[in-house]
Amino acid sequence: MATDEATKPSPIPPYPEMILAAIEGLDDKSGSNKSAISKYIEGKYGSLPPAHASLLTAHLARMKESGELVFLKNNYFRAGAPDAPPKRGRGRPPKARDPNAPAPAPKSPSSTGRGRGRPPKAKSPLEAAVKQATAGMPKPRGRPPKKAKTDGAASPSPSPAPAPAGDGSTPGKRGRGRPPKVRPAVPSETAAA
């Protein structure tokens, strides 16, 4: 039994400890990337599990999220290190303001003029009353029917009278589809004589 314990290799320390030791051991001012950390751990602790790469990636991500490590430009830094860059938020940083420049005057609402976009439609009292009355009712299914044209919607100039039909019938509502081709009158023999 004593020989089994002597030949058994010492267990490797937890991954967070190995990662922090690797970053300290590499001691690079620009930080340590994942491959450098992995090579350092493989060199120092020879017997690693077969899933070493995925375990290292998972632990680096967890330590980055918890704030133990700072990740910048594909390199990892210790969070408490004095040479670690400050953590930046996402997106473009705001422009630096000139301290000597005067502050811009606040705009008054009357000087701005009309707002952006299309002006709102004027609401008629009838539409408002109908909307209030039908507020609790369920909406009907399907497409709503077309609204009938009113006299106010017509153009101010009267439209010209429709041209008479080619067959001499009174103009009326046209049927559906393409109209039949108008055939020229065939000269009769009696008219030629």
Curated annotation (Swiss-Prot):
Belongs to the histone H1/H5 family. Residues 11-81 form the H15 domain. It comes from the Eukaryota. Binds A/T-rich DNA (e.g. present in the storage gamma-zein gene promoter) with a highly dynamic distribution into the nucleus. Probably involved in endosperm development, during cells shift from a mitotic cycle to endoreduplication leading to massive synthesis of storage proteins (zeins) and starch. Keywords: Acetylation, DNA-binding, Nucleus, Phosphoprotein, Repeat. Residues 75-193 are annotated as: Disordered. Residues 87-98, 113-124, 138-149, 173-184 bind DNA. Coiled coil: none annotated. GO terms for molecular function: double-stranded DNA binding; nucleosomal DNA binding; sequence-specific DNA binding. It comes from Zea mays. GO terms for cellular component: nucleolus; nucleosome; nucleus. Confers resistance to nickel NiSO(4) when expressed in yeast (e.g. S.cerevisiae) by counterbalancing nickel impact on cell cycle associated with an increased chromatin condensation. GO terms for biological process: chromosome condensation; negative regulation of DNA recombination; nucleosome assembly; regulation of DNA-templated transcription; regulation of endosperm development. It is found in: Nucleus, Nucleolus. The keyword Ion transport does not apply. A motif (Nuclear localization signal 2 (NLS)) lies at residues 145-149. Signal peptide: none annotated. InterPro entries: AT_hook_DNA-bd_motif, Histone_H1/H5_H15, HMGA, WH-like_DNA-bd_sf, WH_DNA-bd_sf. This is HMG-Y-related protein A. Phosphorylated by CDK, this phosphorylation prevents DNA-binding. Motility is increased when hypophosphorylated. A motif (Nuclear localization signal 1 (NLS)) lies at residues 86-92. Transmembrane segments: none annotated.
